[in-house]
Amino acid sequence: MMKKLIYQTALIAYVNAICFRNFRPTCTKISEQYNRNIIYDSENSYVSHDRLQRLLVFEGKWNTYIQKHYSCLLKLRESSSKKKTYLIIDDTVIAKPYSKELDSLSWIFSPSDRQYLYGINVVFVIWTDGNTRFPIGFRIWNKHDKKTKIDLAMELLNEAKKTYKTKPSYVLMDSFYPAAKLLKLIRKFRWQWIAKIKSNRCINGTQAQEFFRYRYGNHIGKLSENIKARIVKDNDNYWATSDLSLKPSDVKQYYRNRQIIEEFHKILKSELRLEGCSSRESLAQMNHIYFVLMAFCQLELFRITRNIGTIYKVRAVLFDCVVPKNLNWKLNIMAFA
């Protein structure tokens, strides 16, 4: 019980320091920020550098922790909102240009950065209704592992279905992910999907760039392995969807929601320092990702319950606050007006 309490205090310190400050999250700096304004005879105990280091290499069930404490975001919005909801698949690179000893490091092309980066490739699936965002989970891709990023995305979709019982209007993905086996899994779940596809993807046995002879196009055909889809062309862009009832304009409109996961990645990196863990332990790197996701959920829950526009607006006020000693933040709402 005492050990659990010690790790709980360290976790609160780690998550709150990430939320309330903008620095590289080393154990020393987190300890310094959290321990400020603590009185010796108060109920709050000091969190040492060593305790935070032990937390980073502790094999906790962090995914279960996120589900228990933050899935209310998903459930409340999904049950009350009449908006369309989406599951979005994407991956990002956690740049580690100076690391050498981590097993999962490799050179990966980052489309958002338009260059090859040396780092950790992470596959995310998030749920959103266009406003609220909730991370279903993540998987780290290892080039030495037999699992592909498609396989990892399928694991996360299984988690969304079985653990969170989600019923998305559409699953959104870029042109890397609509492999036949992933699309079949979505069909098995009785979900619909919308994806960007490459110009060399075959439609009825002919590449899309040759199938459509004009600038714009719209056709119901079959992709590989007899997967029926509506394919839409707009200049050099191609989309496909399993929902044959959609108009071409609707396909493009709904697909724009995929941009939400790009902003999600931006917040994790620029605001919550996803790339900031300097540990050489693979477990510590993975735990840091979990703690950053907890910080994101904490900010998102605060933003939604207080009806604040963006996480950036929340953070601008938090910078001037003392790092709290619990996760039940009691802040002056007028500061966010």
Residue ranges of model-derived segments:
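Gly/serine-rich nucleotide phosphate-binding loop at the start of the catalytic core
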Residues: 1-66
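Single, function-defining residue in the core of a domain
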Residues: 2-7, 11-16, 21-26, 69, ...
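Active-site-proximal, Lys/Arg-enriched surface segment
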Residues: 17, 54-132
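Residue-level signal for inorganic ion chemistry
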Residues: 30, 125, 294
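Alpha-helix termini
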Residues: 38-41, 75-79, 161-163
